[in-house]
Amino acid sequence: PVTLAIMLLSSVIAGTLAAKLKMHARLSAQLAFRTQILFDTHRLLQKARSQKEILEITCTQLARLFDRSIVAYAAVNGRLAEGHLFSEKEKAEDQSYLTLDEQQIARWVYTNKKRAGATTHYYKNSKCLYLAIRIGDQVYGVIGVPAQKDVLDSFEYSILLSVLNECALAMDNARNAEEKEKNAVIAKNEQLR
């Protein structure tokens, strides 16, 4: 009887330790995957030249990172362009994120420079959480993250904000480079006169 109790106790302890080890291995793999995506995002954004390319890279990486579709609206000439859906799968299937109501919420975010949509006080019945891609008062676009069964936890939300800030910085740098190039062409034309 004593041997049986000791064997039972040791098997319970070994099973518990094995389960904890398996959980830690899974969490470590998930953290490594997220870190790799963030590193790839940074590297790809450094290479990108146009604002459109920067937005596509950002949305594709966010879709991979969160394993859900991402809605993006680029700011063009002071207005939001038509939305695009970037899916974590090969083909984006759900167009319900691009309805007129959802576009109105994205425009509100663009105008007010505040987050809105699901999980917020503004437009809480929306299908997505909308955030502005911005630096200061300059807004470069709006990103929508669908609020599925599971909402973003605080860690995922902080990663989302970090990626959006990096996207905004890359877009700001691209805009500055375009303006510098235009000014150089104007100066060269003035010299030739």
Task: Describe these PLM feature segments.
Residues 4-8, 54:
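Hydrophobic alpha-helical transmembrane segments
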Residues 7-20, 159-183:
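Signal-transmission/dimerization alpha-helices at domain junctions
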Residues 10, 27-32, 101-102, 169:
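Short hydrophobic/aromatic-rich motifs at helix boundaries and adjacent loops
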Residues 23-36, 40-43, 60:
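Short amphipathic alpha-helical coupling elements at transmembrane boundaries
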Residues 34-38, 47, 181-193:
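Conserved HAMP-HisKA connector
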Residues 40-173:
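GAF sensory domains
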